[in-house]
Amino acid sequence: MKMNRTRFAALLSGSAVLLAGTAAVLTWDAQPAERHYQFRDELAQGRFAGYNEYLHMMRANQVTGEIDPAAVQAAWAQLLQTAQKTNTLNWESRGPDNHGGRTRSLLVNRNNSNIVYAGSVGGGLYRSTNGGASWNVVSDPGANQAIGSICQAANGDIYYGTGEIWLGYGGTGQNTTPNFAGRGVYKSTDGVNFVQLASTLPASNSASAAWTAVADIEAHPTDANTIFAATNGGFMKTTDGGATWTQLMSGSITDFALSAAGTIYVNQAGRTMKSTDGATFTEVSAPVVTSTSLPRRAGGRIRYSVSPQDDNYVYCVQTNGSALAAVYRSTDGGSTWSKIGQKGSNFDPLCNGVGADVYCQGIFDLFLTVSAKDKDHVWLGGITVWQWSATGGWVQSSTLNDFAGNPFYLHADSHELIVDPNNPDVIFTSNDGGVFKSNNHGATWFERNLGYNTYQYFGFGVGKDRKLLGGCQDNGTSYLDYTSVSPHGVKKVFGGDGGHSDISWLNPKVMFAETQNGNFYRSDDGGEGWATFSNALLTRTRTAGLPYSNWMMPFELWETTTDAQSQDSVSFELLPGIRSMGFGDGIKRVFKGKINHSQPAAKFIASTVQITAGALTATANANGVVSGDATGVFYEDSAYFEITFNTPPIAEIIVTCDVYLPANSSLTLKSAIGALPVRATTTSRLDVGDEFKVQDPIQSMFFVGLTSQTTATVPKMGGVFMTRDVHDFSKTPEWWQIAHLGSNVTPHYMKVSADGNHLFVSTTSGRLYRISNLLAARTLSQASVDSANAVITVTQIGNWNGRVVTGIDVDPNDPNRVAVSLGNYGNSAYVYLSTNALASVPSFTSKQGDLPMFPCYSVSFDKGNPNRLFVGSEWGMFMADNINSATPSYSEENNGMARVPVFEIEQYRTDFNYDPNNPISSPTE
């Protein structure tokens, strides 16, 4: 018995902090306008704020609006008690291995410059042994993957801190921002194997949750046992290699600098404190601003850098909120200060935009580093990177233009810059695009991300040929088509913040992508060019200045080759057979060939043969005998001919012959979508010139979910829209508003049933809707919510009281079976199942079982096993093989991948044994 191959792909996202991650695939055996517009926006307005709000909405408790660290720690404790990993699912990374994601920490080994470490905020710690040319992950996949800081002790030991304080856990108690909590400090004595320091393990049931964010960690220059750490629970110091810690300062500490001489500068609630002994501190900032003072500055961020050449040279950058306040320099160890830069029209590395669209990110992305060979030279990074020198002032040293070969390109949102301790001309910097390197003191840069699989995906689509299209935070939309030099290298095909993505199975060159805040696009050339396909009906709420959509707008594509209710048709006109023999040369007289017809069932009529070559003509009789200016024969059964011209022709030789199609002939026509074959059978004889029309069963529907709005003049704006024209690139599709969900209700996720008749829509406020009878809606009148003839029905079938319904799946074998996942800490159930989802009043039952109580973001049935459900969660993949039982048992299924949030799961569902090496089974390209 031949077995089909079932494959899964899961979108992985960052643990501990925000989302990071890579695409992965698992396998196991189972039973059977201007269209070409290239969008490259690196700095779309409001990206970071929307990103934060989107994540926080899915994770925070729906009542308090906060994330209780105690709930996070309790869920982690439950996770550790979950059934051990099984070998049912074996994950393989699908990269991308040629680009990187957000990275906050870097380290060059003090004894060997070839060894470099990079800490991503969601993909773990990576190590390079060739100066950054390639990378391998070294952090334990079961450990916390949110690396926020790293250092090397005098004896070579490596320490890294987890948690990204710039997104939350900035103090004690409840968290009102979206980050994924860290789990203290990890240490390695060999640079490869790391263990968690028990002394930094967050208390499992403590609301204060110290050590959930280690913003910075630095090692004493000579004492290998002395390490300092800036944490959400205070400024900490160990003198025994991390066995125990002493709190030097209370409160949330975010930034400090430790000089080559052991001098410390630390930001304590806006005051700059200095210590020369690592124990006692003196303030070097002042409450009163003078020309030589360093002001206190609360409510923003402060970073420091001390020259390794001269301990007296200290630099400090302060932000006013997220905007640049000023940059200061001291040449006397902090006794006096001078301002060397402040926010201005020509100097503003932390903000972007114009007028009302200006946004700043100085809290999120900020670094300050002094040159190791020139104490009068410093780099400042934020959205862009600048450098200052005592002789040249401020100069922008990077651009955001990612064109091939640009030596000044650095990805937006820079977080760190370090200097090789063994070569002051070698510099590494990290940003939301991974790791970049300079060999000439920052004059030019090149990307160093080979094998650094740390992209942060929100959504993705799987093509019929198993190519992947995915949307990433701050890295746009990437296309994995397996043509890269690296095994899993991607092409960046679209900019901004990417989100939901899809690839047509009818025409794999047709793709769909989006950017933040409801902007969506399509491509018909494999991602080379893109164009929006929205219209004024969809954008009415945006035009009215009302909330338009979720930060990542849900959309859904449905396609079929067997739509029995299709009202579209393919017209066919029978044409004669024709063959060109090319041009004569005035010498050759004999020509042989065969006429091929587009319809193999066509019968040729010998008596209609005509042969022309300029003024020369010949015909054939019913027996196929050719006469006139040429002689020869035409064989009616095969359409083969041999002719000899009396005079060698010099014009083009054309042979034509009429045909007919007998009744019950099999035809192959071309669909309007992708010119795919449409099979038909004639009902009577067809002669040349006759027309034949057949139903076109190859159809598609495309759905988008926008925020529903109501005003006095327009009571139904926004909502759920569909089009049947998404494959027609000659025009803007006709959109139909098929559902209005109530004022200010925002869709979060969508899933259509396999038969295309039901669309399930979840919202950010806990509701689940079923939109049915889609197959019967073939016109605007039948589909529109405002039409008296509408056949579509909209039914609310679930309500989870303000929680975000994060994911939906419909059993591909039974549309009555619908599973949903829910977010929001502080609840007791995160997975629900309905077995009567098409009923007038469906019911949903909790399928929490022994699944840890953390937010879940995606669900998927197994097409080959109705008792199996996959769940993508805060900490990876879980599976229940008894989902139909009252209390399912879950196993952790993270074999081959880290414990990272999984925001989308796609099963490669087909009964067709696809063979990529067989052109017959390959989709038409």
Which residue ranges define each predicted feature?
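Hydrophobic membrane-insertion alpha-helices, especially the h-region
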Residues: S13-A24
